[in-house]
């Protein structure tokens, strides 16, 4: 037998190494399958069984169903959009929902400003990140004031750095994302439980029975008592409207109870007929801490609203039937230039016309 050359020895050694490596990786692969271990060099497009090692490459796409340490924004989203937090509680809910919807529609990343976070985060499980003040001040924003209904131009906004403003609160912006919006506006547990505890304690006055159906009633008073007639040639809901709205529910639901909240609770007690034993004045009317009344309304089955974004959002989140005050301004009101009823109230909601006679009286010489 001829002795092996050095070259042959080297080739044999390399072959042994290759075979050993193949055997090792086959063993690892079989073990990973057996124990549910997955390895991915990209953010996965499906859920994987833990434990898992994930290496996210820059700009790698991510499925919305993926639960992983990958970046929260998909690679298709770019730029930075935000919105001025203006107005009170209901206004800022509308601004948040509109920002979220328009940013998604245009493939942009949405951020909220600290003031909006301070208003909404104590009440809801919102998820949009907060824009740091130093980033806000150094960003070359283009500003855009929105009107209160969806328009075609809002679906094709090319600005990477856009700061929105205005008081948008129209379902036409975000209704296609209703479940996502409802998820964003999920109450914190302690607020939901407190509201449900109040409802559990309510009893029908005549029988003492537990109500089967809860109808939340929001009566907007406060500054609207002057603003509506003096600036907008409009009215707020009166006792006749509330009586008709309650009768609408009494005719369609067995043993309902009406849970009244308002920023004018004294007026409600004096003007809403509670003689049937099915009206409960449950709201505290504190405008500085509106979330208690809001939580109560959202835990009801149905809603009676008058005017305003607070009532809109209570009805939108509660679901069920909604009755609203319709045609609450004169036909020549300037308010109708910034407010479109068909964009403000869902088509399935039921409108009851307002009594405009006090406005005709004011208009007389």
UniProtKB/Swiss-Prot annotation:
An annotated GO cellular component: Golgi cisterna membrane
Enzyme class: transferase
Residues exposed to the Cytoplasmic side: 1-8
UniProt keyword terms in alphabetical order: Glycoprotein, Glycosyltransferase, Golgi apparatus, Lipid metabolism, Membrane, Signal-anchor, Transferase, Transmembrane, Transmembrane helix
MF term (GO), any: galactoside 2-alpha-L-fucosyltransferase activity
Keyword Transferase: yes
BP GO terms, sorted: carbohydrate metabolic process; fucosylation; lipid metabolic process; olfactory bulb development; positive regulation of cell-matrix adhesion; positive regulation of endothelial cell migration; positive regulation of endothelial cell-matrix adhesion via fibronectin; positive regulation of sprouting angiogenesis
Compartments (UniProt record): Golgi apparatus, Golgi stack membrane
Pfam families: Glyco_transf_11
Xref: InterPro entries: Glyco_trans_11 (IPR002516)
Record topological domains on the Lumenal side: 26-365
Family, per entry: Belongs to the glycosyltransferase 11 family.
Its biological purpose: Catalyzes the transfer of L-fucose, from a guanosine diphosphate-beta-L-fucose, to the terminal galactose residue of glycoconjugates through an alpha(1,2) linkage leading to H antigen synthesis that is an intermediate substrate in the synthesis of ABO blood group antigens. H antigen is essential for maturation of the glomerular layer of the main olfactory bulb, in cell migration and early cell-cell contacts during tumor associated angiogenesis. Preferentially fucosylates soluble lactose and to a lesser extent fucosylates glycolipids gangliosides GA1 and GM1a.
Main localization (coarse): Golgi
Organism per entry: Mico humeralifer
Pathway membership, UniProt: Protein modification; protein glycosylation
Catalytic function, reaction form: a beta-D-galactosyl-(1->4)-N-acetyl-beta-D-glucosaminyl derivative + GDP-beta-L-fucose = an alpha-L-Fuc-(1->2)-beta-D-Gal-(1->4)-beta-D-GlcNAc derivative + GDP + H(+); a ganglioside GA1 + GDP-beta-L-fucose = a ganglioside Fuc-GA1 + GDP + H(+); a beta-D-Gal-(1->3)-beta-D-GlcNAc-(1->3)-beta-D-Gal-(1->4)-beta-D-Glc-(1<->1')-Cer(d18:1(4E)) + GDP-beta-L-fucose = alpha-L-fucosyl-(1->2)- beta-D-galactosyl-(1->3)-N-acetyl-beta-D-glucosaminyl-(1->3)-beta-D-galactosyl-(1->4)-beta-D-glucosyl-(1<->1')-N-acylsphing-4-enine + GDP + H(+); a neolactoside nLc4Cer(d18:1(4E)) + GDP-beta-L-fucose = a neolactoside IV(2)-alpha-Fuc-nLc4Cer(d18:1(4E)) + GDP + H(+)
EC number: 2.4.1.69, 2.4.1.344
Keyword Magnesium: no
Ranges annotated as spanning the membrane: 9-25
Membrane topology reported for the UniProt record: Single-pass type II membrane protein
Glycan attachment points: 65, 301, 327
Protein name: Galactoside alpha-(1,2)-fucosyltransferase 1
């Amino acid at each position: 037998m001829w002795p092996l050359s050095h070259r042959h020895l080297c080739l044999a050694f390399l072959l042994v190494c290759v075979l050993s490596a193949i055997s090792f990786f086959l063993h690892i692969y079989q073990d990973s399958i057996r124990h549910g271990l997955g390895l991915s060099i990209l953010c996965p497009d499906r859920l994987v069984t833990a434990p898992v090692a994930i290496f996210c490459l820059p700009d790698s796409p991510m499925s919305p169903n993926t639960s992983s340490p990958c970046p929260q924004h998909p690679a298709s989203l770019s730029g930075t959009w935000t919105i001025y937090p203006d107005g009170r509680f209901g206004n800022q809910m509308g601004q948040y929902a509109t920002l979220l919807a328009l940013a998604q529609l245009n493939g942009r990343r949405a951020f909220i400003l600290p003031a909006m976070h301070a208003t909404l985060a104590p009440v809801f499980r919102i998820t949009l990140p907060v824009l740091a003040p130093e980033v806000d001040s150094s960003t070359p924003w283009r500003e855009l004031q929105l009107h209160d209904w969806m328009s075609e131009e809002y679906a094709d906004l090319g600005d990477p750095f856009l700061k929105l403003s205005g008081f948008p609160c129209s379902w036409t912006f975000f209704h296609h994302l209703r479940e996502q919006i409802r998820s964003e506006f999920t109450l914190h547990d302690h607020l939901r439980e407190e509201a449900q505890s109040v409802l559990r304690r309510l009893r029908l006055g005549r029988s003492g029975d537990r109500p089967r159906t809860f109808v939340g009633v929001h009566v907007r008073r406060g500054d609207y008592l002057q603003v509506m007639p003096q600036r907008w040639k409009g009215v707020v809901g009166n006792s006749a409207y509330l009586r008709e709205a309650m009768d609408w529910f009494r005719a369609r639901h067995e043993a309902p109870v009406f849970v009244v909240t308002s920023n004018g609770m004294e007026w409600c007690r004096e003007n809403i007929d509670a003689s049937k034993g099915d009206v409960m004045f449950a709201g505290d009317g504190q405008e500085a801490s509106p979330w208690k009344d809001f939580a109560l309304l959202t835990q009801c089955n149905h809603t009676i609203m008058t005017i305003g974004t607070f009532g809109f959002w209570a009805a939108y989140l509660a679901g069920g039937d909604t009755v609203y005050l319709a045609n609450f301004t004169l036909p020549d009101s300037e308010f109708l230039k910034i407010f479109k009823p068909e964009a403000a109230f869902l088509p399935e909601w039921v409108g009851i016309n307002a009594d405009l006679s006090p406005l005709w009286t004011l208009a007389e010489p």
